[in-house]
Amino acid sequence: MPDYRSKTSTHGRNMAGARGLWRATGMKDEDFGKPIIAVVNSFTQFVPGHVHLKDLGQMVAEQIQAAGGVAKEFNTIAVDDGIAMGHDGMLYSLPSRDLIADSVEYMVNAHCADAMVCISNCDKITPGMLMAAMRLNIPVVFVSGGPMEAGKVKFRGNEKAIDLVDAMVVAADDSYTDEEVQAFERSACPTCGSCSGMFTANSMNCLTEALGLSLPGNGSIVATHANRKKLFLKAGELIVSLAKRYYEQDDSSILPRSIATKAAYENAMTLDIAMGGSTNTVLHLLAAASEAEVDFTMDDIDRLSRNVPVLCKVAPAKQDVHMEDVHRAGGIMSILGELDRAKLLNTTVSTVHEKTLQDALNKWDIIRTEDADVYEFFRSSPGGVPTQVAFSQNRYYSTLDGDRENGVIRNAEHAFSKDGGLAVLYGNIALEGCIVKTAGVDESILKFNGTARVFESQDAAVEAILGNEIKAGDVVVIRYEGPRGGPGMQEMLYPTSYLKSKGLGKDCALITDGRFSGGSSGLSIGHISPEAAEGGAIGLVEDGDLIEIDIPNRSMNLKVDDETLAARRKAQDEKGWKPVEERKRKVSKALKVYAMHTTSAAKGAVRIL
């Protein structure tokens, strides 16, 4: 039976000094010997998805204390990708994921904590904490801050639901007046919480449910609803129970690596494909699996993507549907329920809250349960009042959305598409693969042949798009923006949004060794591996080259003969694999260190030593 890790610093005569310091934090005689639970918070006033978390850590701590544990809270950093977008701040976003993972490891191991509650929410925070949980392999429960309510704007006689991406698109569209743009800006992000569509933050919080590491509703109930408070209270109580099961009953089945097995990672990816989640989830699941020493690769993702239908379309794929609508339809447990009925899920895996995923679905899938409390939970609706306060309203929808033929969540027979929401493409530009969010691609351009317009940075591409230099039929190629080449693998939300603004969303493609925001849609292909900075063929593309994209057949190729490519490669080897044009980009020592040790997107951009 394993000893509590915390005994290292709380027991023995030679730990008198450490106990003295613990006492200075408020611990009493009776606390020594109880499990010490790290409350890993990520409160910051910089990020709307985290601005409401300040008091929630102490709420969880009180539940831990009441359940017989000792709670100790600390914070991680949190970068807002939307605020960091479109300038050099985005270079720091992906590297912050690894910094968060390291900081959690440092704090938990330095202080010998026994278990964790991870209070996350936005883009890199949930993945960073997930990587740490896999690395540490101590009992953990994830609970996130929850989605923002969708914005509402009265526009030209109609009211429509909007989000951050809508504000970005209209801002670059000259057909909108300044007053209309301001109305979108003021209405797009009305409350605290992670941006309201199926963007990266919400995608990852949904995937923690599929991995079995969070409670039902974690990915879908809005941040403002009083019922979300129940998740935080339950997390504090549950983590003490899990800690005691492991340390006092020798039950290792509740450890993260025992729950998040390869089958669980496949379930999570299956969910992501079915709901058209962010392409960034590919990076993060690969990275978390690497930390857990699980053999989960791009080949697994490719295999799954060929068999899983699209059962749910949410903004940006379907602009009038947001996370609040997914929750009304039964949330993630109901999407998983439909996948189970389609025999696309492994339900023997375990969770932190039920013995098996099958048990969880029997209790929480609104199609199979008859529990009135579950129905009421999923009727939790947005409040419609701008606020930065968590749990500040208790409005309810009058009915649930249980329509599986035409509703927000579909069954397999009535799927939005039989082909999945994400696809892995291979070809001579991407020998190790690349990713496209097919749920956001118009059917008319699933096959696309176009001529290359090559840019050595995101900034140069944006300038060309806004300068009306990009025409229908072009393939915008943005390179040297990968994990090493950026460094930091910037998101390309501005270029994709501006292509929409210019009316080119269905007439152009954008390919890059960088990545895309969960808010991106259109024929946007990212994560091209190997990247240009590693000698990838994307570094050999020239203006005017023909590029052939064939999503149904999972391919993307540069239509240039092998002899020409070999000659270009020889010339590039002599010059060095770096941008042709000098970029006005300050790369700090911190970013240089990241670039030295990161791997390709195909491996999750994890570190190598």
From Swiss-Prot:
Keyword Amino-acid biosynthesis included in the entry's annotation: yes
Enzyme Commission code(s) on record: 4.2.1.9
Catalytic activity field: (2R)-2,3-dihydroxy-3-methylbutanoate = 3-methyl-2-oxobutanoate + H2O; (2R,3R)-2,3-dihydroxy-3-methylpentanoate = (S)-3-methyl-2-oxopentanoate + H2O
PROSITE patterns: ILVD_EDD_1, ILVD_EDD_2
Cofactor(s) required, per the database record: [2Fe-2S] cluster; Mg(2+)
Organism domain of life: Bacteria
Cofactor note text: Binds 1 [2Fe-2S] cluster per subunit. This cluster acts as a Lewis acid cofactor.
A cellular-component GO term for this protein: cytosol
Residues the record lists as binding [2Fe-2S] cluster: 122, 195
Pfam families (alphabetical): ILV_EDD_C, ILVD_EDD_N
Entry keyword set: 2Fe-2S, Amino-acid biosynthesis, Branched-chain amino acid biosynthesis, Iron, Iron-sulfur, Lyase, Magnesium, Metal-binding
GO biological process entries: isoleucine biosynthetic process; L-valine biosynthetic process
Gene Ontology molecular functions: 2 iron, 2 sulfur cluster binding; dihydroxy-acid dehydratase activity; magnesium ion binding
Assembly information from the UniProt record: Homodimer.
Function: Functions in the biosynthesis of branched-chain amino acids. Catalyzes the dehydration of (2R,3R)-2,3-dihydroxy-3-methylpentanoate (2,3-dihydroxy-3-methylvalerate) into 2-oxo-3-methylpentanoate (2-oxo-3-methylvalerate) and of (2R)-2,3-dihydroxy-3-methylbutanoate (2,3-dihydroxyisovalerate) into 2-oxo-3-methylbutanoate (2-oxoisovalerate), the penultimate precursor to L-isoleucine and L-valine, respectively.
Family named by the database record: Belongs to the IlvD/Edd family.
The protein, known as: Dihydroxy-acid dehydratase 1
Gene name of the record: ilvD1
